[in-house]
Regions:
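Anionic N-terminal interaction surfaces
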Residues: 1-6, 57-59, 66, 82
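Nucleic-acid endo/exonuclease domains
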Residues: 9
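Non-transmembrane, membrane-adjacent beta-strand/coil modules in membrane-associated proteins
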Residues: 12-69, 90-91
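Cytosol-/stroma-facing membrane-proximal "stalk/adaptor" domains immediately downstream
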Residues: 67-91
């Protein structure tokens, strides 16, 4: 299952370890930062996604590295191009 999806102008988060709102309107997002963490001792590689909103709050979550998540992150700039959202890939 994918870590997130975008539909009807809303960013939906499907990850278990996200302790804030899981539905974020795209109009309220200022920046999405994506970082990559190597897996150590059998933990597996992960993507670390930080969503910064215009009101100053941030939401972060982890996604595992897989082919589906790689494709999802490659399509992210095209999915949010109608909104003034900066996407920072730090890997």
């Amino acid at each position: 299952m994918a870590g997130f999806h975008i539909a009807n102008g809303i960013f939906y988060i499907h990850v278990a370890f996200c302790f804030k709102k899981r539905r974020i309107p795209l109009a309220s997002i200022r920046r999405i930062s994506i970082d990559f963490m190597r897996g150590r001792k059998g933990g597996g590689a992960r993507y670390f996604v930080i969503i910064e909103q215009k009101d100053g709050t941030t939401t972060m979550f982890f996604m595992g590295k897989s082919k589906t998540n790689d494709a999802l992150l490659e399509q992210l700039p095209q999915a949010v191009q109608r909104y003034p959202i900066k996407i920072n890939k730090m890997y």
